[in-house]
Regions:
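Short pre-active-site segment immediately N-terminal to redox-active cysteine/selenocysteine motifs
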Residues: 18-19, 25-29, 72
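Conserved helix-turn-beta segment immediately C-terminal to the redox Cys motif
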Residues: 18-20, 37-56
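A short, hydrophobic beta-strand/beta-hairpin element that forms part of a small beta-sheet core
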Residues: 22, 40, 64, 74-88
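Structural microenvironment flanking redox-active thiols in thiol-disulfide oxidoreductases
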Residues: 58-65
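Non-catalytic, surface beta->alpha helical segment in thiol-disulfide oxidoreductase systems
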Residues: 77-107
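Conserved Rossmann-like nucleotide-binding pocket used by diverse enzymes
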Residues: 6, 26, 52-54
Length: 107
């Protein structure tokens, strides 16, 4: 299951991570977010130890969403070395295999 990421743990879990990190920026009211949620959770289970997978609820973490200029949901951001290196916006092309491949390429 993906790790809930908040202002309290974002720096430690994402920015200071020694492994690549996938962060799913989502909201409870977002239908497409609910569609990809199970895919993100599957990636979290499949990549445990080699990567981190987190979820940021943009409604409760508005400042964090602003920091990364999140304007559309869902947005998946890939972090390496504390920097965003790639983003995927929407559901087009989001599969477990694609997400795992993108994380593996960052390892």
């Amino acid at each position: 299951m993906a790790l809930p990421v908040t202002s309290d743990n974002f720096d430690e879990e994402v920015l200071q991570s020694e492994v690549p990190v996938l962060v799913d920026f989502w909201a409870e009211w977002c239908g497409p977010c609910k569609m990809i949620g199970p895919l993100v959770d599957a990636v979290a289970s499949d990549t445990e130890g080699s990567a981190k997978v987190g979820k940021v609820d943009v409604d409760s973490q508005q400042e964090r969403a602003r920091t990364f200029n999140i304007q559309s949901l869902p947005t998946i951001a890939f972090f390496k070395g504390g920097e965003v290196v790639e983003t995927m916006i929407g559901t087009m092309g989001v599969t477990v295999d694609v997400l795992k491949e993108k994380l593996a390429a960052l390892a």
